A protein has these predicted regions:
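Active-site-adjacent structural elements that line small-molecule/cofactor binding pockets in enzymes
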Residues: 1-295
Length: 295
């Protein structure tokens, strides 16, 4: 967990399918706006992560590239290590490898992969993370990643089991701040009090590693003042009680002018330790103004 006043990093996860030319344009635009990381999601119907990352590297000069995040049970760990190491070679060491346990049952069924219990999927993630660490630590391993220890591991999660795995293996821990309802309903946001409790639990798990691990928060939306009323109408019934009348305080939303949003992010870095902030593609442009203020 990086120091509360650590330097910000900003990422954007690109979700919309695109032609080659459009993909190149979007990646270059992200770099122009000041983003540090371009992320590629791992859902059926979207571009395959590793080819998309390699093209993103060819189209840009400095941004790092991440899977944000893989459905880890889709992948054999040894073959995933080869994919990640090759991508790291071909991007000159710009890859970060994001891992998640997977949560969309329909995608598993479509792919013909058993949708195991949550506990089993977390075990699969833990085994994969340990295998990646072991292989990349072997000086004889080929293909050799450019980064000496291999691509940094980003592990996403919120629950106790996933955070225990992340505390053991991750260089970056990504927290969602919101999750889809199990019945397919609107996002269920997490308030400040619940986030405080998660951070306390995570600090305990990390122990001496706390200052070395970077914390990421995924912002579900960046909402300018003129869209506040519509956003409240959409999200209001599903907000936690401690911020029901103050949605600006939700860790997974940004609401206000660019200056107000910048201040909110500084406050969250101070309170929770979130120094790495990711937005979805739909928020890429408005977030650019906030990034400029925080450089």
């Amino acid at each position: 967990m990086t120091a509360a006043r650590g330097k910000f990093r900003f990422g954007v996860t690109l979700l919309a399918p695109a032609s080659r030319a459009e993909w190149v344009r979007k990646c270059r635009r992200a770099e122009e706006l000041g983003y540090d990381v371009v992320g590629v999601a791992d859902h059926l119907g979207l571009p395959a992560p590793f080819p998309a990352m390699i093209l993103a590297a060819e189209a840009t000069e400095r941004v790092r590239l991440t899977t944000f995040v893989l459905n880890t049970p889709f992948y054999n760990a040894v073959l995933l290590a080869r994919e990640a190491a090759t991508a790291d070679q071909l991007t000159d060491g710009r890859v970060e490898l994001g891992l998640g346990a997977g949560y969309v049952r329909e995608e598993f069924e479509t792919a013909g992969i058993t949708f195991e219990s949550a506990g089993k999927r977390v075990e699969q993630l833990a085994t994969t993370a340990a295998t990646l660490r072991r292989l990349f630590a072997d000086p004889e391993y080929q293909p050799r990643p450019v980064q000496p220890a291999g691509p940094p591991l980003v592990i996403a999660g919120w629950g106790d089991r996933l955070l225990r795995v992340a505390a053991d293996h991750a260089d970056v821990i990504a927290l969602p701040g919101a999750a889809p309802a199990y019945n397919g309903g609107p996002l269920q946001f997490v308030g400040r009090d619940a986030t405080d409790a998660r951070m306390a639990y995570l600090r305990e798990l990390l122990g001496a590693r706390a200052e070395a691990v970077e914390l990421n928060i995924l912002l579900q939306r960046v909402i300018p003042p003129e869209e506040r009323s519509a956003a409240l109408e959409l999200y209001g019934p599903h907000l936690p009680a401690d911020v029901a009348d103050r949605p600006e305080e939700l860790p997974a939303l940004l609401i206000g002018t660019p200056k107000e949003m910048a201040r909110q992010l500084e406050e969250r870095r101070e309170r929770f330790g979130f120094s790495y902030v990711t937005v979805l593609e739909s928020s890429m442009e408005p977030m650019g103004e906030v990034i400029e203020l925080l450089r």
